[in-house]
Amino acid sequence: MASFTCSSPSSILPIIDTRSGNLRCTFQSQVSCGIQRDDNGRRVWRRRTLTKKDDMLRYKMQRVPFVEEQVRKIREVGKVMTMDIEQLLLREDNRFEFVNSVAAEATEYVDKNRDEYGGSKKAIFHVLSNRVNDLGFDRPEAYVEADPYKPGPGYLLEYYT
């Protein structure tokens, strides 16, 4: 006896008996997708469940990734210095006089010590950092910082001991 069954909620074709050599087939088609009915009887299509848990939540890291690189980028681009200059200019009544006084002070620094200013340390940055420090904000001298992400001279000693 051979029978083929396909299910459809609404259409059933006639059955042919195979006992006498006739083939018995029942054809039904059933749609098995994510169509559901809500309380009002409307069909709701859901591709996936809406209450999905975060798989990576249990692998929470101790630090925010790439923060060190972002801090380095901000310092290299000079956003901190730009904000400091804007803050100093907003506090001054006469901006042109302020710029001229900063330039004159930077020229004095260069005249006093030409060897110190020329490489990575700039006299104008020294003047601006001094003015911002006078306002109460902590800035390194001439905005020069050693790279905190490069290992120091004792790096190999610490690594192997």
From Swiss-Prot:
Compartment(s) of residence: Plastid, Chloroplast
Induction annotation: By light. Induced by cytokinin (e.g. trans-zeatin).
Encoding gene per record: PTAC7
Transmembrane stretches, start-end: none
Tissue: Mostly expressed in leaves, flowers and seedlings, and, to a lower extent, in roots and stems.
GO biological process: chloroplast organization; plastid transcription; response to cytokinin; response to light stimulus; thylakoid membrane organization
Designated name of the protein: Protein PLASTID TRANSCRIPTIONALLY ACTIVE 7
GO cellular component: a single term: plastid-encoded plastid RNA polymerase complex
Subunit structure: Component of the transcriptionally active chromosome (TAC) complexes. Interacts with FLN1, PTAC10, PTAC12/HMR/PAP5 and PTAC14. Binds to SL1/MTERF3.
Disulfide linkage: none
Source organism of the structure: Arabidopsis thaliana (Mouse-ear cress)
Predominant localisation class: plastid
Domain of life according to the entry: Eukaryota
Transit peptide: 1-32
Task of the protein: Essential for chloroplast development, especially for thylakoid formation. Involved in plastid gene expression, probably by maintaining plastid-encoded RNA polymerase (PEP) activity.
Keywords from the UniProt entry: Chloroplast, Plastid, Transcription, Transcription regulation, Transit peptide
Xref: PANTHER family: PROTEIN PLASTID TRANSCRIPTIONALLY ACTIVE 7
InterPro entries listed in its UniProt record: PTAC7
Reported consequences of knocking out the gene: Albino plants with defective chloroplasts containing a few appressed membranes but lacking thylakoids, even when grown under normal light conditions. Reduced plastid-encoded RNA polymerase (PEP) activity.
